[in-house]
């Protein structure tokens, strides 16, 4: 099995679910020290906004602590992680005004807890079907990534979540 983290999101080649390593040493995010394309650093998570995405506003909220499943987080860390996910979702909703926000957790491609946030729109290319991240047809500009970073900063200003970055 070959694990990698592509700029447009997590992907896996070959193997099956039984071959996914759950250990921190098997995790490409942990080996690198953080995910790629980070636009915000929060108390319990990083927010990744790759330059190519399936939909405008897509981000992944990636837990700083290495776990594969949400239930593996201690209670206080779990609450902090979900608070960060909800703050980011609200920031995206305020910025993009979607008709719906989709929350997806898989973990069968990269063994590290991360939540995909997809703002959904009336005329998006996935109406009536699941989002396929391999159909990354939206390319966002540096300005778009900066807008996302600033929206998250505003949303987290009054919380215990810490800082926002843009690279």
List where the protein language model places each region.
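HIT superfamily nucleotide-processing domains
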Residues: 2-5, 9-167
């Amino acid at each position: 099995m070959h694990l990698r983290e592509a700029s447009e999101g997590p992907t896996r080649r070959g193997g099956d679910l039984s071959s996914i390593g759950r250990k921190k040493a098997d995790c490409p995010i942990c080996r690198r020290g953080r995910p790629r394309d980070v636009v915000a650093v929060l108390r319990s998570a990083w927010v990744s906004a790759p330059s190519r995405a399936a939909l405008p506003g897509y981000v992944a909220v990636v837990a700083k602590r290495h776990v594969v499943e949400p239930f593996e987080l201690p209670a206080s860390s779990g609450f902090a992680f979900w608070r960060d996910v909800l703050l980011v979702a609200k920031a995206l909703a305020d910025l993009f005004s979607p008709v719906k926000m989709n929350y997806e957790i898989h973990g069968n491609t990269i063994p590290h807890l991360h939540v995909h946030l997809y703002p959904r729109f009336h005329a998006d290319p996935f109406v009536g079907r699941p989002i396929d991240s391999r159909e990354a047809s939206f390319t966002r500009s540096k300005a778009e990534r900066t807008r996302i970073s600033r929206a998250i900063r505003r949303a987290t200003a009054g919380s215990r979540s810490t800082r926002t970055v843009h690279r």
